[in-house]
């Protein structure tokens, strides 16, 4: 083999190695972002528990309409968005705790599959921001001390799942950073607890990979 041929093979091998290295560092999106402003009917949504519907809510981003959960006697209330399953994903939603004496919370459900899921939630009756997993019952994974979000005001929840790295934000503040790999993919949803009456608006789901 000539010296020129050896150099060509070496250059090609180096290029392939560089491309493989780049591919390992960057995950291609699974598909387009999903955005829900709740101006249309809830086609494709799946109610697991609770009483969910579209209502006029002050401060909603578009047309004054938001998704509201009104059941007050269930332990937990969950609704699943269309699409998925999602593995690595970034999710955000605006929520407004309207009322609740036992609880006044709002949360994002992610990697929901066969009734099991992760949850990040805030509660207007508690000075904490928490990450849980649910498998027949709820288990706390991580908690941050905060000033409880104000009742009757809009707030923003965000969660990012990258493999086993689960992170959470409240009103743009990074508060949770935890590792847990028991659930790898599933659907996205919204959550309330007990007697919480809560409005949700501007749900955004950004897939990071093919899940």
Question: What residue ranges belong to the model's regions?
Answer:
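Secretory/extracellular carbohydrate-interaction modules
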Residues: 71-130
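Short, aromatic/His-centered strand-loop micro-motif at the edge of beta-sheets
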Residues: 136-156
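Extracellular carbohydrate-recognition regions
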Residues: 26-49
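Ligand-recognition surfaces built from glycine- and aromatic
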Residues: 185-211
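N-terminal secretory signal peptides and thylakoid transit peptides that target proteins
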Residues: 1-17
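Short carbohydrate-recognition loop motifs
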Residues: 56-77
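Short tryptophan-centered beta-strand motifs in secreted/extracellular beta-sheet-rich domains
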Residues: 93, 153-162, 166-168
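Short, solvent-exposed beta-strand-to-loop segments that form ligand-recognition rims
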Residues: 171-189
């Amino acid at each position: 083999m000539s010296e020129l041929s050896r150099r060509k093979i070496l250059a090609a091998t180096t290029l392939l190695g560089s491309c493989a290295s780049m591919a390992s560092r960057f995950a291609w999106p699974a598909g387009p972002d999903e955005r829900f402003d709740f101006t249309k009917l809830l086609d494709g949504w799946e109610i697991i528990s609770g009483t969910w519907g579209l209502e006029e809510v002050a401060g909603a981003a578009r047309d004054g309409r938001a998704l509201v959960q009104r059941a007050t006697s269930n332990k937990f209330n969950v609704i699943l968005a269309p699409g998925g399953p999602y593995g690595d994903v970034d999710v955000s939603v605006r929520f407004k705790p309207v009322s609740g004496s036992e609880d006044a919370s709002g949360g994002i459900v992610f990697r929901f599959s066969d009734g099991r899921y992760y949850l990040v939630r805030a509660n207007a009756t508690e000075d904490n921001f928490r990450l849980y997993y649910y498998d027949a019952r709820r288990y706390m994974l991580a908690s941050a001390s905060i000033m409880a979000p104000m009742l009757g005001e809009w707030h923003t929840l965000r969660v990012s799942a990258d493999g086993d790295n689960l992170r959470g934000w409240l009103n743009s503040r990074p508060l949770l950073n935890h590792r847990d790999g028991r659930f790898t993919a599933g659907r996205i949803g919204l959550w309330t607890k007990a007697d919480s009456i809560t409005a949700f608006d501007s749900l955004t789901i950004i897939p990071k990979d093919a899940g």
